[in-house]
């Protein structure tokens, strides 16, 4: 990624100009926690999206994909939290359609300009009575400062809300990108429930905006794993409404590259926040791989290591077991010469040219304990570096350790 010319600003999702958001309690969750999020652009916005590749998809996924088929404009995103509306048959589809139509009518916009998302328990339909009464309440709560409330309303088993906003100078004006995300379990996206909604006030051509988002997702959300399970509801929506009044970006070039780099930075921040918030996790794991023939191969190895249950368990046990890292690298489906393999854990070099090195095991274990006790998303990252040869490919993936609490949380999820 190019050198950052942007800076982080407050406001999250609604930091970009021309966006409002709300997060309310509509009664969809039995807990009484916020459960309905609404994001609205004051003007037509170019919409891009990436969806789950699961063959079992929620109604909201197929419906929103259909909404964007041949249409690149969206004005609103509605997300309910509590029921996934997946594996709910024809009635689930009808509920998704009605959700969009109800919102469009209330906002007085075309229904094809509404995208919908759901998260919660698979097999449960949306509580439509609560949704019908919640939509006007959410509209009434819309605010240019509503980003944090929307970030809270999309959560399920998450422990913390996930949001960010960045600002980039372009000439005598600035462009902003904001985003929110949710995800804690069932996280192994390929585009958990993993949802992310991104706003931008740049003017970008539809094809270029979609290409930017797809590449950003490949380098962020598609590089995280908590438990290896891909959700039925995964989606990323990105709206760009042009309200920054900067010149339209219609083709690749230095300005487009800067915007894409900032979009990728937003996605990577949110992706890492999801991985760190993995159910029962005590630390974030970052796996850096280099030396492959290309970047895709490096990303594949990194993701395999980050997703290895044995690696994750070793990190939770504060065990610097490099053998598990090497084994995971070897089964990633990427060819390399094991005699070139090198592994580092933090500052400790464990393996060089395929041969183990002496290291202070107690100090390495203490490094893992210190990361588990570190400040959230600051000093809590376990760094694993893997070198497989002389190639120029590089890749990064993120995950978390696997604790007893992960099993407890998921064993008791619906009981």
From Swiss-Prot:
GO molecular function, one term: glutamate N-acetyltransferase activity
Pfam families attached to this UniProt entry: ArgJ (PF01960)
Primary localization class, coarse: cytoplasm
Site description Involved in the stabilization of negative charge on the oxyanion by the formation of the oxyanion hole, residues in chain: 119-120
GO biological process: one example: L-arginine biosynthetic process
Family: Belongs to the ArgJ family.
Assembly: Heterotetramer of two alpha and two beta chains.
Name of the featured protein: Arginine biosynthesis bifunctional protein ArgJ
Organism for this UniProt entry: Synechococcus sp. (strain ATCC 27144 / PCC 6301 / SAUG 1402/1) (Anacystis nidulans)
Lineage: Bacteria, Bacillati, Cyanobacteriota, Cyanophyceae, Synechococcales
């Amino acid at each position: 990624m190019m050198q950052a010319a942007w800076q982080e600003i407050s406001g999250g999702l609604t930091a970009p100009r021309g966006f409002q958001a709300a997060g309310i309690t509509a009664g969809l969750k039995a807990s009484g926690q916020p459960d309905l999020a609404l994001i609205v652009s004051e003007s037509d916005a170019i919409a891009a999206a990436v969806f789950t590749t699961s063959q079992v998809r929620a109604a909201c996924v197929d419906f929103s994909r259909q909404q964007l088929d041949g249409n690149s404009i969206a004005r609103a995103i509605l997300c309910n939290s509590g029921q996934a509306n997946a594996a709910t048959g024809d009635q689930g589809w009808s509920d998704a359609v009605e959700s969009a139509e109800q919102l469009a009518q209330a906002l007085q916009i075309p229904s094809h300009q509404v995208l919908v998302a759901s998260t919660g328990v698979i097999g449960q339909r949306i509580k439509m009575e609560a949704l019908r009464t919640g939509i006007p309440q959410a509209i009434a709560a819309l605010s240019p400062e509503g980003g944090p409330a929307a970030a809270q309303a999309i959560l399920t088993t998450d422990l913390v809300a996930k949001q960010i906003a960045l600002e980039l100078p372009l000439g005598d004006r600035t462009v902003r990108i904001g985003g929110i995300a949710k995800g804690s379990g069932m996280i192994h996206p390929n585009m958990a429930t993993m949802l992310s909604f991104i706003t931008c006030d740049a003017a970008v051509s539809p094809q270029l905006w979609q290409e930017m988002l797809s590449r950003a997702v490949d380098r962020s959300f598609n590089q995280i794993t908590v438990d290896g399970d891909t959700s039925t509801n995964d989606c990323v929506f990105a709206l760009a409404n042009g309200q920054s009044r900067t010149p339209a970006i219609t083709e690749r070039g230095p300005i487009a590259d800067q915007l894409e780099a900032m979009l990728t930075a937003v996605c990577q921040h949110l992706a890492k926040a999801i991985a760190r918030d993995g159910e029962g996790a005590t630390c974030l794991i970052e796996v850096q791989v280099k030396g492959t023939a290309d970047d895709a191969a490096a990303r594949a190895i990194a993701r395999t290591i980050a997703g290895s249950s044995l690696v994750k368990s070793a990190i939770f046990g504060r065990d610097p077991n490099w053998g598990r890292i090497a084994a995971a690298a070897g089964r990633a489906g990427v060819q390399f010469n094991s005699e070139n393999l090198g592994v580092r854990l933090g500052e400790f070099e464990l393996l060089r040219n395929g041969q183990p090195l002496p290291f202070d095991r107690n100090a390495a274990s203490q490094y893992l304990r210190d990361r588990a006790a570190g400040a959230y998303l600051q000093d809590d990252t376990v760094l694993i570096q893997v070198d497989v040869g002389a190639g120029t490919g590089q890749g990064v993936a993120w995950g978390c350790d696997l604790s007893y609490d992960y099993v407890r949380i998921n064993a008791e999820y619906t009981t």
